[in-house]
Structure formats: C-alpha cells, structure tokens
C-alpha cells in the first residue's frame, strides 16, 4: 500500500508544524505528504517548507479557495493508491499510519474517517468531541455515514465518486463518505490515537459547538447538501465569492 497524505491549509502557520513534526515520528512512514495551500496570507508555506528535508513533502497551491478544492488539488497530484486527508490541526501518535494500514487490510475498508481525541483543558470541550466521535461511529452503521477532519479513501473510490464536491459550502467531508457508501464501497471508522486541537472552540467559545449543531440540523431539514453560506467559514466552498462568505455571520 502506498499512502499519500494530503493536508489542506489556509493560514495554518500556528499548527501545521505540529502535524508535520508528528509525521516525522511515524513508525510506518508516509510515502508522500502534500501540503495544499489555499490562499494563505501568513507563513503557512514557509513553515511547511522547513520539513522538506525531513519528509517526502510536496507543497502546492490550490487555484480556487475552499477545503474541497484544496483536497481535490492534492489528490490530483498524489501518486498513492491510498489517500488520507488530514486537517492541519491534528497530531497523530507514532503508530497512526501503522494502525491504519493494519485495520484497512484486515477489514477491507475503502473509505471512511478516524476516531480523534480533543486536546483541551476544558472537560466540556472534551465531552463534546467524544460525543461527535460516538455519533460518527453510530452513523457508520446507517445509510448515512459521516466523517470529518481526517478522512481516507482508496484512489479507486476517490475517482469513482469524483472526490470532494466543491459546490458544497460546508460538510463536504460528510458528503464524501456518504457518496462512497452509496457507490457500494465498504466504510470504516479507523480507531487511532490522534489528537485534535481545540483552537476553534477557544477562539469561538460556545459558538463553534452551536455552529456544528446548526449545520447538522440544517443539513437534515433542508437536504443533505448545503451549498450556500449559513455562517462564516473561511474554507467554505460553494458558488459564493470569498467576500460574501466573510460577511456572513
């Protein structure tokens, strides 16, 4: 199995180094790591370049904004037969890739997501994150599986479902897993030790949690595809301009 890791970034200078450093410590080294810069205005690219001699690293720039565009751009240049899409604020433990490879081979999973633990001093944030992981694992056994933050797919599955939908404003990750399920691929939630930063919760406080709940409710009451801005999100997709997104709150 040749594993390509794709990391979409927009202004992630404060966290991307931690992820790349963690990837240098993997017992099973990634075959390829692609950082996709999505119009950053900080030093994300420069900080990523510091790892060019430590990792099989490639840095590219997405031609359009949005997380879906960035992930698809990374997949377009990736050479692996297994693609892993990681948010920049994740910190996997040293056995992350080794555990992933074993579980995928054992269960013949073709697409899905990973369990995560929220790194936070606040118990309410940790409990909220645990709830979301539990919800994801529950939904994996329904016709409507979901995934977020860290996802994977075989190259064949990715190409069959046409990757991530750039027309979606949010929850393109949910849609990605759902499309794979509907295409007949076996979905699996990989149990790993991977920490996720609580920075969005620290920056937005309870608003971040409310946004997640609102997005989920909106998704089920207005259809599973959210194509218009329902709140401000810098990595959102869809047909609106970045100015329109920034003015949405």
Describe the role of every protein-language-model region.
Residues 37-46, 90:
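A conserved acidic beta->alpha catalytic loop
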Residues 62-78:
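Glycine-rich, basic loop-to-helix element that forms the pyrophosphate-binding segment
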Residues 11-25:
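Short, well-formed alpha-helical segments that are part of the catalytic scaffolds
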Residues 113-149:
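Short, flexible, basic/aromatic active-site loop/helix in glycosyltransferases
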Residues 83:
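Short aromatic/hydrophobic "clamp" motif used to bind/position activated sugar donors
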Residues 30-39, 60-63:
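Short beta-strand/loop segment that forms part of the nucleotide-sugar
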Residues 95-124:
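Conserved donor NDP-sugar-binding/catalytic core segment of glycosyltransferases
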Residues 170-176:
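Acidic donor-binding loop at a coil-to-helix junction in glycosyltransferase catalytic cores
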């Amino acid at each position: 199995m040749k594993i390509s890791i794709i990391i979409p970034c927009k202004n992630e200078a404060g966290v991307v180094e931690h992820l790349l450093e963690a990837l240098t410590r993997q017992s099973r080294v990634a075959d390829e790591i692609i950082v996709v810069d999505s119009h950053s205005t900080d030093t994300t690219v420069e900080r990523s370049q510091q790892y060019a001699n430590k990792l099989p690293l490639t840095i590219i720039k997405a031609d359009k904004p949005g997380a879906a565009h960035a992930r698809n751009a990374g997949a377009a240049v990736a050479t692996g037969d297994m693609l892993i899409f990681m948010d920049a604020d994740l910190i996997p433990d040293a056995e992350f890739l080794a555990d992933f490879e074993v579980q995928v081979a054992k269960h013949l999973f073709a697409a899905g997501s990973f369990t995560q633990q929220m790194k936070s001093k606040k118990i309410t944030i940790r409990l909220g994150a645990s709830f979301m992981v539990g919800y994801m694992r529950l939904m994996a056994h329904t016709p409507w599986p979901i995934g977020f933050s860290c996802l994977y797919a075989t190259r064949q599955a990715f190409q069959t479902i046409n990757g991530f939908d750039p027309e979606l404003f949010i929850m393109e990750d949910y849609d990605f897993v759902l499309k794979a399920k509907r295409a007949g691929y076996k979905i699996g939630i990989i149990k790993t030790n991977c920490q996720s930063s609580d920075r969005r919760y620290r920056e937005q406080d309870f608003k971040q949690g409310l946004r997640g709940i609102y997005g989920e409710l909106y998704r089920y009451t207005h259809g599973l595809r959210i194509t218009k801005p329902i709140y401000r999100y810098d990595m959102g997709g869809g047909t609106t301009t970045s100015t329109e997104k920034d003015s949405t709150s």
